[in-house]
Structures are given as C-alpha cells and as structure tokens.
Amino acid sequence: MFQLDNLLGGRTTVTFDQSHRLRELVADWQLLSDLSFADLILWVPIRKDIKLWPTGHIAVAHIRPTTSSTVFINDVIGNEVTWGARPNIDEALSSGDIMRNTEPERIGDLLIKEETIPVFFEGQVIAVISRHRNAEHMRSPGKLELNYREIANHLYQMVSEGNFPYQSAGSLFEPVPRVGDGLIRLDVNGAISFASPNAKSAFSRMGWRGELEGRNLGEVAEQVV
C-alpha cells in the first residue's frame, strides 16, 4: 500500500477518504481478477487541481489472476497515459459507465480484450479499473467459466455503483480467498445455483453425499456441521 499512497500523493488530487476507498478496493480485488480470468489495472486521473480536466491517467495498482495466465509480463505500476490515448478509460471516467463493447487488441503474441469499469465513491468516479483478458480463452467457455464471469460482472457493477467492497468494513476476506479452492453461487433465496468441482469436493470431505445444486446452503451446512 506504500507504493499506492506515494503514487496517489504525487500526481493526483485524490482526497484522504478517496485514497482509503481505493485501498479497500485493492485489498479485495484478487477475487475480481480470479473470477474474470483477467489482469486488473487501477487508473487514477492526473491533475493538479480538482477543478481542472485530467491530463491523463496513472496506473497505481495491478493484480494478476491465479485462474489464468497474465497478459502483462512487465510491471505496469507507475505507467502514465495521456488523455485521449486510451479512450475507454477516458469514457469510463467521464460517463460513469462500464465500457464493454471493445474490439480485441493484439499485444505481442496475444489478442487482448479490454473493458473498463468506473470506481464510484460519494457521488463521483474517482478511478477506473481496466480489465484485460486473453480473447482466445473466451471463445468456448464451460459452465464453470460462465458462472465465474457472471459473478464477476455483478461485482463490477457493484463497483461502478459504489457498493463493492463494503465501505469501512475492513477486508471482507482474511486471508484473501482463492477462487480455485471452491466457489458456491446462491440465488436470492439462499439456494445453491452453482457449485464448482472443488466446492463439491470440500462438502464431500465434510460428509455431504447428495447433490448441492438446488439445495439451501443453510440446510446443507446444518447437516454437515
């Protein structure tokens, strides 16, 4: 977090509360990266005064997924881009909308799809997340991949609305969870709509012998505790 604070203090007009919010996001965003099989870069607008239009953006944080290979071999933290050089980042900051309909771009040997997500806090967009995925890995997703991505998209929508992570609650996850260890998805009634293979194995080791999907998680937990 020391590097994050240094970058924010030197090139941006981010306030103390905004900086705290970005630290909360970075503390929990491994989950976002893993669920979307993507590298994430956090961009903050560069400007000398809050009343001035940004001259560009600076990358203040970067996370690589544990569920897929990275698309960035070199460190990108501290990189700067001028306004207009990355229109999708500009647009997410200006409009507050998630920018998804972008054409893949070739970077080295990889065809990379970029999406940008505004980070909303107290009535304004304070930063932008750029999400970078290998387009080749997106062509034939299975049930697990589709569920991961759908969950990720819900969480990114919450980020754009200022609802994830929960404010001033500390990190939700201690230690930081690995999606690959097992994931369960619930519907609004608490019923399991999807359980990854590792999640099923974990419940099996606890003594559960039936199907998980379609069952109420609370009822399942009561039977294995």
How would you describe each model-predicted region?
Residues G10, P45-I46, L52-A85, L144-A152, ...:
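PAS-family sensory domains
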Residues R21-I41, S160-A195, A199:
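Sensory modules in modular signal-transduction proteins
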Residues I129-A169:
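Sensory coupling linkers of modular signal transduction proteins
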